[in-house]
C-alpha cells in the first residue's frame, strides 16, 4: 500500500543534464533550486516551513548577493510555520522576490506581501485572499480565554505587519481582514500586496 507522499514523489519529473563528467539527473525542484527558485505549494505547515527555511539558508550561503525567487501557490495554514518562513526571508541577505501562481490565501498572502518591495508579483489569473487568523481551540473555559487572547495578539501583530508591507493605514487593514477578502491580481497590486502583474518574462 502506497501512501500519498510516495505517490506524489513518484509523480515529480526528473530532468537529465549533460555535464563534462556525463549525465546527471535531478528532480525538477532540485534543478530549479540551482536557478534560485523555491516553490511554496500547498498548506503552510511545520515540515514544509522547515524545508523552505533550509532552502533559503542554503541559497544565502551559495550567493548572498543574488536574489531568491519564491513561487507561492498556497491556501495558507499555520501562523507559526508561516512566521518561521517570513522571519527567515527578512533575516537573510539576498532579496526574496515573491510570485503568486494560482492562489495565495491567508498566510500565503502574508508571505507574498513579505517579499522585497518592488519584487513582489502575481501572474494574471492568480487570486489573493486576506483574513484574520482562525481560532478553533476547545477545552476548559480558562484555557479558551488564554487562547482567545493569544489569537487577538497574533491578529493585531499580523495586521500591523500587513499595513507596513502594503502601505495601507492600519484601520483599513483591520477592516479588510475582518472577513475573507478575495482579490484579483490587479486588485492585489492596487492594495499594495504586490507590486506588479506579470504576463510575460521581461
Swiss-Prot record:
GO process terms (BP): protein quality control for misfolded or incompletely synthesized proteins
Catalytic residues in the record: 106 (nucleophile), 131
GO cellular component assignments: cytoplasm; endopeptidase Clp complex
Compartment(s) of residence: Cytoplasm
InterPro entries according to UniProt: ClpP (IPR001907), ClpP/crotonase-like_dom_sf (IPR029045), ClpP/TepA (IPR023562), ClpP_His_AS (IPR033135), ClpP_Ser_AS (IPR018215)
Function per UniProt: Cleaves peptides in various proteins in a process that requires ATP hydrolysis. Has a chymotrypsin-like activity. Plays a major role in the degradation of misfolded proteins.
Membership in a protein family: Belongs to the peptidase S14 family.
Protein name as catalogued: ATP-dependent Clp protease proteolytic subunit
Organism: Shewanella baltica (strain OS155 / ATCC BAA-1091)
Amino acid at each position: 500500500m502506497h501512501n500519498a507522499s510516495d505517490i506524489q514523489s513518484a509523480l515529480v519529473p526528473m530532468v537529465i543534464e549533460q555535464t563534462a563528467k556525463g549525465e546527471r539527473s535531478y528532480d525538477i525542484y532540485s534543478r530549479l533550486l540551482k536557478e534560485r527558485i523555491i516553490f511554496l505549494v500547498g498548506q503552510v505547515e511545520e515540515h514544509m516551513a522547515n524545508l523552505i527555511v533550509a532552502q533559503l539558508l542554503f541559497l544565502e550561503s551559495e550567493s548572498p548577493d543574488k536574489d531568491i525567487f519564491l513561487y507561492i501557490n498556497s491556501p495558507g495554514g499555520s501562523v507559526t510555520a508561516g512566521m518561521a518562513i517570513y522571519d527567515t526571508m527578512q533575516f537573510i541577505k539576498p532579496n526574496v522576490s515573491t510570485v503568486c501562481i494560482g492562489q495565495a490565501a491567508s498566510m500565503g498572502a502574508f508571505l507574498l506581501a513579505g517579499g522585497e518591495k518592488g519584487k513582489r508579483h502575481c501572474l494574471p489569473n492568480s487570486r489573493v485572499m486576506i483574513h484574520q487568523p482562525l481560532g478553533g481551540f476547545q477545552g476548559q473555559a480558562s484555557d479558551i480565554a488564554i487562547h482567545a487572547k493569544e489569537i487577538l495578539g497574533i491578529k493585531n501583530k499580523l495586521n500591523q505587519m500587513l499595513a507596513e508591507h502594503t502601505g495601507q493605514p492600519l484601520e483599513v487593514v483591520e477592516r479588510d481582514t475582518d472577513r475573507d477578502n478575495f482579490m484579483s491580481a490587479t486588485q492585489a497590486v492596487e492594495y499594495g500586496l504586490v507590486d506588479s502583474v506579470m504576463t510575460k518574462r521581461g
